[in-house]
């Protein structure tokens, strides 16, 4: 790959399906079929990314299965089990203002309106009602917290996101 940006992982290859090289696909996209909006895929084998093309895909019961170019036997398919599926960062859609890819929020410093550094975003948790920032507190947190869970509700709790500076401003009590 010529891009210096890391590929964006959108899913993972599961077990083989049938004898003609089809594979079960686990997708991390919002909709199950969303992963098929991207082409080509990048598959990580033995630490290296390589490009592959999806030739067909379909729902198989509750699962999604796909056929990849050059994978025509069960043995070839089994060699890809548990490989990550990614796309180049350039393929990601431009988002409207005030919408963010989770991957871009990871590692951002979180500060509240009183200037208290709450820590860094470690991950984002989907709760059903709204997403939640899991913020790993600083080692010497003045409130004795190891982590904080801050609802990602813009204008109410999350006041500003500056991806260039990797900063998030929140209206959140550090003792909560």
Curated annotation (Swiss-Prot):
Main subcellular location of this protein, as a coarse class: cytoplasm
Domain of life: Bacteria
Function: An accessory protein needed during the final step in the assembly of 30S ribosomal subunit, possibly for assembly of the head region. Essential for efficient processing of 16S rRNA. May be needed both before and after RbfA during the maturation of 16S rRNA. It has affinity for free ribosomal 30S subunits but not for 70S ribosomes.
Subunit structure: Binds ribosomal protein uS19.
GO CC, any one term: ribosome
Domain comment in the entry: The PRC barrel domain binds ribosomal protein uS19.
Keywords, ordered alphabetically: Chaperone, Cytoplasm, Ribosome biogenesis, rRNA processing
Localization of this protein: Cytoplasm
InterPro entries the record matches: PRC-brl_dom (IPR027275), PRC_barrel-like_sf (IPR011033), RimM (IPR011961), RimM_N (IPR002676), RimM_N_sf (IPR036976), Transl_B-barrel_sf (IPR009000)
PANTHER family: RIBOSOME MATURATION FACTOR RIMM
Domain PRC barrel as annotated: residue spans: 96-176
GO terms for biological process, alphabetical: ribosomal small subunit biogenesis; rRNA processing
GO molecular function: ribosome binding
Family named by the database record: Belongs to the RimM family.
Gene that specifies this protein: rimM
Entry protein name: Ribosome maturation factor RimM
